[in-house]
């Protein structure tokens, strides 16, 4: 029996059966790996599909911010239009600035002419009051303003009218204008100091 077992060779059929049994066992792990890969890929696809609407929505929202989107193009055109309007406003300002020096020069000329006329008027008025003060008898203590000078001139005219109506002046004295003027000046000063000027203020 020992000889039969040891001497009996293994048949090729038995080898093929053993090989065929071993091959499925070897082939099963790769199939399991492939199934795992397929499951992983399907799970990834399902996850991608679930996130697809959200991604599409986010893509839709972000699409408005893309530089190539139509809304962005319209905004760019509007901003360009506003920039053009600003440029036009700047151009208008430059044109108005070009015309401003002429108006400024005209205003300066008008001011200069007005100042010259005012100086001439003031000078002529001062000369007239200086001449009037030479005619009106005044006291050394008089510091008369222009209004007071005019009032004193009116009172002096009233005094002269009263003197002409009286017969106090002698014909000889009247012939000498210088002496007459001195006497009138003295009489007018006395008249002022006696208060006759204040009494005749109602005239």
From Swiss-Prot:
Q: Where are the transmembrane segments?
A: none
The record's region (Disordered) falls at 1-106
Looking at the keywords, is Chloroplast present? no
Instruction: List the protein's name.
Output: Twist-related protein 1
Using the record's annotation, list all stretches that form the bHLH domain.
Answer: 109-160
Query: Which keywords does the record carry?
Result: Activator, Biological rhythms, Developmental protein, Differentiation, DNA-binding, Myogenesis, Nucleus, Repressor, Transcription, Transcription regulation
Annotated region (Sufficient for transactivation activity), positions in chain: 162-192
User: Gly residues composition bias: which ranges?
Assistant: 47-66, 81-100
What GO MF annotations does this protein's record show? Answer: DNA-binding transcription factor activity, RNA polymerase II-specific; protein dimerization activity; RNA polymerase II transcription regulatory region sequence-specific DNA binding
What gene is this protein a product of? TWIST1
Q: Gene3D superfamilies from the xrefs? A: Helix-loop-helix DNA-binding domain (4.10.280.10)
Q: Where is the composition biased (Low complexity)?
A: 1-18
What is known about what this protein does?
A: Acts as a transcriptional regulator. Inhibits myogenesis by sequestrating E proteins, inhibiting trans-activation by MEF2, and inhibiting DNA-binding by MYOD1 through physical interaction. This interaction probably involves the basic domains of both proteins. Also represses expression of pro-inflammatory cytokines such as TNFA and IL1B. Regulates cranial suture patterning and fusion. Activates transcription as a heterodimer with E proteins. Regulates gene expression differentially, depending on dimer composition.
